[in-house]
């Protein structure tokens, strides 16, 4: 009997009975006692009798040679997950071991560990399908009819196994006397609740963007200049971000550019470089950049707190509000102090630049037409087209907010921040070109070269000039319209008429050309007179400047004489 049992029973039979026991949803001891009691009611002398265990796609039936039968109902889908085609094995039923009882009395594992159930570790980019295995809770479902799809139809569902007719007959007969039907219903409800909970958790994570399936932009490069020991840099990045989350490229200027795989690796690399006191610079992440809009149609003296509250009522978080100023020479305000007088000719404009926090619906803020009692217009702020220069290290291409290099003065190129209070030198020295001007001077040759590269290229489509060329049009002055078609005209009349028309055309051209020449001459004469008047005014201006310089020199000499004569 032992040999026949070893040959007829599959190697994974214990695992299958273990899974069927877990579907029942009860402890091993309770299930054993119930099965033992059911067997004892029908026949108390079942010990040592050979039994036959049949596993169908809908229920598990344990029957002996007598009339005693015990049936454990499971769902159709669970049977498809657990069972293979029906097999029969012979064993011995005793009062201590049941065929559906595992060899170990371990605690039941969660239902998420059953086969054919999606796992978060295996499928991190997919959520559970809520439409699968949806049943009414608390009601045991009857066997579903088998629907065979057509060969031409493409389906992703798993093919169901055909049911055995004999097993279906025995199942229908055993439904009336089944003592474990409630266990089957409770197991189905338990599995459905766990599946719904997992689906809700994954759906909420996907909506929040906190899972791995959330989309993110490509992080910018981290620029590290003057790297003398690249091995140490790689070792530090490997320990902090991981060797597979970054790569390095060297530019033609010798700057090491570190490209990371995701924003988390980017932030980790920046923190590590800051710990090492490394000099570097980078740009802001796209997810952290504010959404900048322009608010028009609102009074300039409206408090910023009121505007912030109005945007908060619409569901947007305001990060910063800025009201620009413009020059107003008509309304000059003079503020006189003890030793100096300053002129304030800038007034606030009736518009605000507002930085909003990034969000999924932040673009909907452009549809706002009313803030409080004001009828407003919200537009996307235009991007600044001028060349960006760092006010910390004076290098072009990044800002001081994301620069970790040593400060350099924009006036004397000293090792300090730009400021006349800290700068003791009177000589200007540009750090970029070495010229005698400040680093922010518009005439810097390095700045001019960088600005040329920023000019946008023409986006007009390339057209074929030969195909777009138009034929030359005749002047309207020499054009004579054709006459209506007439009959009974000889060839001599036509030739005579053509000769007359050519003579008339030559006469008209001779009369028109002198007129055009006279008009051009008059225009040139007017332009020449204007240029002469401008030259005269420029000469007068130069003389006035020269006299002013001479007077300034005389004034300085007079001051020096007065200083020398002052008694000490």
From Swiss-Prot:
Function as written in the Swiss-Prot or TrEMBL entry: Strongly basic protein that binds directly to retroviral RNA and may be involved in its packaging and in the reverse transcription process.
Acidic residues bias spans: 189-203
Spans annotated as Disordered: 128-170, 189-218
Keyword Zinc-finger annotated: yes
SMART domains documented for this protein: PRE_C2HC
Originating organism: Drosophila melanogaster (Fruit fly)
Region listing for Three zinc-finger-like regions, in residue ranges: 390-444
ZnF segments: unnamed: 390-403, 403-423, 430-444
Signal peptide as annotated in the record: none
Official protein name in the record: Nucleic-acid-binding protein from mobile element jockey
Keyword Zinc-finger in record: yes
InterPro entries linked to this entry: Pre_C2HC_dom
GO molecular function, one term: zinc ion binding
Keywords: Metal-binding, Transposable element, Zinc, Zinc-finger
Pfam family, any one: PRE_C2HC
